[in-house]
Amino acid sequence: KPGFAYGGSCLPKDSKALRTLAHDLYVDCPVINAINPSNELQKKNAIDIIESKGKRKIGILGLSFKAGTDDLRCSPIIDVADALLGKGYEIKIYDKNVAISQKTNTNADFIAAKLPHLHGIITDDLDSVCSASDVLVITNKGKEFADVPAKYPHKAIVDLVRQFQTIDYEGNYEGISWGNINQNPAQNDKLVRDMATTEF
């Protein structure tokens, strides 16, 4: 589905292999060659949206590349968290699967070696992250995020995966490909009217 940057153990490796094979065979593949730069641009767009909120306390909901796994390989949100930490933002990360795997040492060595700066800010306590943050960044479609808007009605929410198809939200709700609007029928009608009068 269209949206935020991809990650995981397969797509990054497969796209690199296809680029290498095409290069070795002298085949021009502009679409395949554009995949990685486009993916990096999606990360930058996410960072820009988060920074546009003007808040310094950021809660990241989900660190693994998809819901229901503790797999951190090539997870794009790690790059986003790194960039925000480097700019002095206060980051808290909720990911129950990663937090549990840290405790059981499944991911402990990987995190210690590759992500030492993230150690200590990852938790399995969703409410503590949401309460302490001014901006909540939803990075995967975990079922536990469904109640976040209702429980925290005045937080800025950056939804990178379109967790909610429709939402009537009092706070600021924005996604990476659907603009700074609340996803409710009145706002959708306004967006359609605005697009009809826009010259491309």
Over which residues does each language-model region extend?
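Structural/interface elements that position substrates and couple domains in central-metabolism enzymes
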Residues: 1-200
